[in-house]
Amino acid sequence: MRHGKVHRKLNRTAEHRKAMFANMCASLIKHEQIVTTLPKAKELRPIVEKLVTLGKKGGLALRRQAISEMKDQDQVRKLFDVLAKRYADRQGGYTRIIKAGFRYGDNAPMAVIEFVDRDENAKGLDSGQAEEKAA
């Protein structure tokens, strides 16, 4: 029976899952929209929602807690300075998941996870190695 099994394993070890979701949180905060598989998006959503709630509460201890969860200080700064102000009046529901068809190759269900009221200019901003080489 599946009683009490809340999260998906996603065929990964616990350390791999934790690192993957930390990276996905940082990417979502950076670009405000990412494309991933539907099960990963569904698992990522509550993690990001809790991080935004930490950002709204503010404070040094909560900032350190967010850093330990995400490992990317620049995105934690954006979380506490930009996103916390944007969602100050919203009581949860900071993200949405939109189904995006199926991936060619393995037919995996894909989804777009994005912030509600997101900044359209953040998408693809400072993305990948090409940007670093050009700078």
Curated annotation (Swiss-Prot):
> Which GO molecular function, any one, fits this protein according to its record?
structural constituent of ribosome
Keyword annotations from UniProtKB, A to Z: Ribonucleoprotein, Ribosomal protein
State any GO CC term.
cytosolic large ribosomal subunit
Q: Pfam families given for it?
A: Ribosomal_L17 (PF01196)
Judging by the UniProt lineage, the source's domain of life is: Bacteria
Q: Name one GO biological process term.
A: translation
Q: Which InterPro entries match?
A: Ribosomal_bL17 (IPR000456), Ribosomal_bL17_CS (IPR047859), Ribosomal_bL17_sf (IPR036373)
Glycosyltransferase in keyword set: no
Q: Which SUPFAM superfamilies match?
A: Prokaryotic ribosomal protein L17
Its family remark reads: Belongs to the bacterial ribosomal protein bL17 family.
What does the annotation say about its assembly with partners? Part of the 50S ribosomal subunit. Contacts protein L32.
Q: What is the designated name of this protein?
A: Large ribosomal subunit protein bL17
Instruction: Give the originating organism.
Output: Rhodopseudomonas palustris (strain BisB18)
